[in-house]
């Protein structure tokens, strides 16, 4: 499909730079294809679902994945650079998006932290620095880094020297601060590894989760470590030419059994966020049976995709021409979503990671 079919005009003022406070005070646009749009609030979610339905949450935890450092090369001068970690390949290796990538080459050494350590680092770190070697340089500014530390020692160093990776549409307008450390993390986050938040989950407060439990709605956790590729624009003119970056997901046997039981009793599986949806779809057979899953997924969902696992979706409002707007258009229909987004813009809904939410129901085949 042509990528320009997924384009729309979005006023700069619609981009949220801070979340609603409290979390569950966000607005919720309910989208049922063929029906009138409904303006509700996130707090209404328990009343919009049925007892026995299951909300599926992505419990990944955002790590401080933005590292600043100095490139060192034999016979050359130091060059400041930045690496945004996005996919762990081994205990000592991460793929990252680098700036300026054109100044880096295989064999270069980078010292992160130390003198001139990161602006906005997550905490004071006792390390003098963290060293890595550039092993590969790929397309789109991607590099492969081999660190001198590995495993938990590397995790600790990144936690101390790294900075929170706010999306560019926020970070380009204001500095990261202490509020973001809490705001850009779900209240149920528990598995470190994401470099971007599963933002639909940011709306859920402890009080709202209690309300979900009281309504008899099941809560199920899966893990997909969101990568920085989620921020990358689609540069191709046609969706067929776009390559998704892989992300690591885990859905264990017990969770698969719980999800299959939801469907068996006639209830619905409701994904909280596109990341949960992508993992569920990756783990589900064509007949709708959910299987255990552990590994990488690069599933790219566009209109024409036949959904296997998910009956409804809670998600934020996404960027024009993005893979996420393509996904929601596949779920509820492109015309439906273009109309819903036009309504949201006209009605003052707030967009992107810190913005408002929508509850989407699927477009049914005629």
UniProtKB/Swiss-Prot annotation:
GO terms for molecular function: S-adenosylmethionine:tRNA ribosyltransferase-isomerase activity. It catalyses: 7-aminomethyl-7-carbaguanosine(34) in tRNA + S-adenosyl-L-methionine = epoxyqueuosine(34) in tRNA + adenine + L-methionine + 2 H(+). One of its GO terms (cellular component) is cytoplasm. InterPro entries: QueA, QueA_dom1, QueA_dom2, QueA_sf. It is found in: Cytoplasm. One of its GO terms (biological process) is queuosine biosynthetic process. The keyword S-adenosyl-L-methionine applies. Keywords: Cytoplasm, Queuosine biosynthesis, S-adenosyl-L-methionine, Transferase. Pathway: tRNA modification; tRNA-queuosine biosynthesis. It is an enzyme of class 2 (transferase). Monomer. Belongs to the QueA family. PANTHER family: S-ADENOSYLMETHIONINE:TRNA RIBOSYLTRANSFERASE-ISOMERASE. Transfers and isomerizes the ribose moiety from AdoMet to the 7-aminomethyl group of 7-deazaguanine (preQ1-tRNA) to give epoxyqueuosine (oQ-tRNA). This is S-adenosylmethionine:tRNA ribosyltransferase-isomerase. It comes from Methylorubrum populi (strain ATCC BAA-705 / NCIMB 13946 / BJ001) (Methylobacterium populi). The gene is queA.
